[in-house]
């Protein structure tokens, strides 16, 4: 029904770097995902096509008095709403796309395409909980729909801070496995099965077999090739993995595939190796927010904060509802010691954050870090304000409680 496109982003200082790396690789921070060039991440680039639609040839004519639309009129309006949503999504006008798909759902709530399209819009914006719900609605309307199964599997492997990731990863594997049973010649289904296994920490012959089956079905499937290379490297089979990476880079003809390769490199902490790959991706698509996000992440790890700021700001202009982008932009401002900018950016991030993400914002790389910066700058009153904001988000943070008390005692009354 929907179809798919295979496009899938001193000792004290040492401790700080390790903490930052763990935060960068954690669920809520590092896993922005590439979906049609709009998101990216270690789960792999994967873009479900827009739901199929056929725009009506004649616009609905006004009637002299209100009448109940007949089935043909409802169908025409539904198809037009889907088309409007598809066009808006392709133009990255997400609010308009969401409105259009919701309108389609109201017209035909049992047609899976409306919920499926809505899920795509949420996934494009990394709104994983809402995307999951929308895709589940699509599956409820069409339980054996392979496209919906794979879309849901994709969303479920996106780690979420504080979420029940283990169960989600297991569900993702189950949905992908069901898809392979329904369509045993679907290369994407086997690739998603392998991705779900890797998300669960399964780097063994079963994961390898899933990716090899995908490549057997489609030898030109570069995305599966990159996924296989990652598994082989994890199994210390570098002699097999590295040629696959090199081949994938040579074959990559589009930005999303290059983003996937770069993200796989960053997953292995090959930060500097990822930079030329991302530069090439941005030559192909200067507004690819996935490439911009990964570039900013690499620069943050390397303490190139001014360059990271530029990358994250550009990514945020394209995807303004990304918590991860705003969170790491705030981290760049901390590195630049621009604490007022960090405070404002973390406030924007708080508006986009899940409950678990809000707790994260209360820590050392959030409002707590802003408070530390203000203390360092001798601005104790502002430090108290930042610490209090951190405690609003994470009331049980004992370290911030202690720092707030000390700052309050030093603050002028």
Language model features by range: what are they?
Residues 78, 112-113, 146-147, 187-188, ...:
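Helix-start (N-cap) detector for alpha-helical repeat units in TPR-like alpha-solenoids
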Residues 63-80, 355-364:
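TPR-adjacent "capping" and linker segments in tetratricopeptide-repeat scaffold/adaptor proteins
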Residues 74-107, 120-124, 161-165, 195, ...:
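Alpha-helical segment of the N-proximal tetratricopeptide repeat
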Residues 92-99, 124-137, 160-178, 200-213, ...:
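Structural signature of tandem alpha-helical TPR/SEL1-like repeats
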Residues 153, 158-164, 199-202, 357, ...:
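Short coil/turn linking the two alpha-helices of tandem helical-hairpin repeats
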Residues 107, 141, 182, 217, ...:
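Structural marker of alpha-solenoid helical repeat scaffolds
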Residues 117, 151, 192, 227, ...:
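Canonical tetratricopeptide repeat
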């Amino acid at each position: 029904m929907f179809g798919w496109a295979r496009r899938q982003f001193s000792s004290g200082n040492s401790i700080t770097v390790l903490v930052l790396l763990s935060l960068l690789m954690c669920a809520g921070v590092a896993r922005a995902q590439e979906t049609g060039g709009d998101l990216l991440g270690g789960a792999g680039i994967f873009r479900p096509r827009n739901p199929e639609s056929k725009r009506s040839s004649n616009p609905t004519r006004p009637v002299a008095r209100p009448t109940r639309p007949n089935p043909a009129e409802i169908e025409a309006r539904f198809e037009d709403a889907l088309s409007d949503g598809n066009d808006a999504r392709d133009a990255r006008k997400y609010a308009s796309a969401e409105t259009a798909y919701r309108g389609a759902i109201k017209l035909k709530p049992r047609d899976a395409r409306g919920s499926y399209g809505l899920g795509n819009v949420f996934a494009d914006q990394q709104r994983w909980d809402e995307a999951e719900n929308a895709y589940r609605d699509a599956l409820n309307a069409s339980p054996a729909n392979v496209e919906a199964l794979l879309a849901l599997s994709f969303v479920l492997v996106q780690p979420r801070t504080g979420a029940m990731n283990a169960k989600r990863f297991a569900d993702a594997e189950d949905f992908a496995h069901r898809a392979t049973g329904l369509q045993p010649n679907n290369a994407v289904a086997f690739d998603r099965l392998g991705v779900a296994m890797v998300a669960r920490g399964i780097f063994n012959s079963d994961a390898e077999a899933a990716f090899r089956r995908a490549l057997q079905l489609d030898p030109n499937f570069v995305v599966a090739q990159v996924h296989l290379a990652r598994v082989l490297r994890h199994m210390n089979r570098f002699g097999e993995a590295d040629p696959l990476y090199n081949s994938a880079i040579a074959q990559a003809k589009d930005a999303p595939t290059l983003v996937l390769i770069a993200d796989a490199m960053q997953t292995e902490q090959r930060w500097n190796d990822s930079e030329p790959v991302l530069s090439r991706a941005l030559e192909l698509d200067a507004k690819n927010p996935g490439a911009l996000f990964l570039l900013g992440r690499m620069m943050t790890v390397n303490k190139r904060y001014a360059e990271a700021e530029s990358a994250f700001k550009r990514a945020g202009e394209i995807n303004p509802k990304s918590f991860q982008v705003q969170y790491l932009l705030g981290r760049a401002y901390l590195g630049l010691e621009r604490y007022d900018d960090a405070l404002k950016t973390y406030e924007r991030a708080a508006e986009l954050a899940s409950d678990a993400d809000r707790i994260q914002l209360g820590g050392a790389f959030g409002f707590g870090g802003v408070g530390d910066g203000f203390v360092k700058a001798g601005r104790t009153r502002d430090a108290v304000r930042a610490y209090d904001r951190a405690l609003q988000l994470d009331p049980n943070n004992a370290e911030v409680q202690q720092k707030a008390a000390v700052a309050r005692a030093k603050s002028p009354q």
